Amino acid sequence: MNKFKSSLVAILLIITSGFTYSQTMFKVELDDVLNGKIKIEPAVPANGEVAEGTVFTVTAIPDNGYVLDAGYYSVKGMWGSMYNESMSSPFKVTVSQDLHIGASFIPKSEVDHINVTQNVVYAQPGVKPLKYDVYSPKGAKNLPVIVIIHGGGWSSNTEDIMRGMARELTKDGKYVVFSIDYRWRNKLDGGDQNVTMANIIEDVFGAIAHIMEHAKEYGGDPTRIAVTGDSAGGHLSAVAGTMPNKIGDGGFGKTPGVFEFMPSYMPKGKTVEQVRDEMMAAIQAAAPSYGVFGGNLLNHYSDDPKADDTWKEGVAPLSNIPNVSERAIPHYLTRGTKDMLIKDEAVKTYVDALVDAGQRVEYVQVGGASHAFFDWKPDARTKETFKKYGVYYIHEMEAFFNSVFYPEK
């Protein structure tokens, strides 16, 4: 009997040993943390080798005078490190690939002036809940609203990447800022349904419809809205500025020559015509940064065999600028002189089209800046770029918004 038990134990040890040996291991590294520290349970082994499925609990602890900006884990992405962030502590990280773990802290003075509301869900047309964050100056009442739309090739990032801009735009206490998220193109959200550019635009209009419905809860005026965004968000903010007249229930390309957008969120009791008319009146300024404006540079991302170049024009601000006699939508455009993705000529083409339509437009080139200088991430390089180029031109943008919403008498 004892011999039998010994054999059984030996077999189990062999099986267990084989199972352990076959486990997939990944490298987990801890980033240097400034102005605070992180506590991780269980501890990361000295060699950084961690089994797939391991769950870490990370607690971020700021130094005196600082607050948590974000805890995160980062992985390699198409354009460098991609950050998965948590604005609260503790947070959990489940290991499924090589990754870095860290935290970013900022001076408390950066957020003392505002109330921040995270992750307000406005719709869920696919697998991903669509949400926005609100940055409201303390004591805000009936302030104009700024809606920020993030970039990332319509295929990455969330509203979190624009939080630096949101904080800056609220420092003078003149605006309530909403930073929105949207679906990613094709099936990059992990769903079975293909997401087209028209769907993404419907998310933008849905977010704005939800914001208009709830703006007063945060001290905002739903009848006075500005839109801004960078890169892909530059395109989408230009769409929001120039094309709310295309909101409708006629479908996008289903009928030849008809390209309309049904917002992914519709307020109860309102018709699509009401939402369209209210949004056309409310959106009064646009500040797209280093965006794509022409249909020749856009993709409709549709798998419909009927999709052709007219579908690209249907999502192109350049092809849909209203004449100022119909609707005024002043623009403030920015681009870095060393931007290798967005060319000066492409922005100038949009500027010329706005001028031809009688619209007011200001185009500012930022000397020495490359792409995405309005973004905010936990890494030192992005923060330094934001400080060097972003902060100043955000306040120049705010001066433009002030000229619309706080005109000199």
Where are these regions (language model features)?
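Short beta-strand/loop motif that positions the catalytic acidic residue
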Residues: 327, 332-335, 339
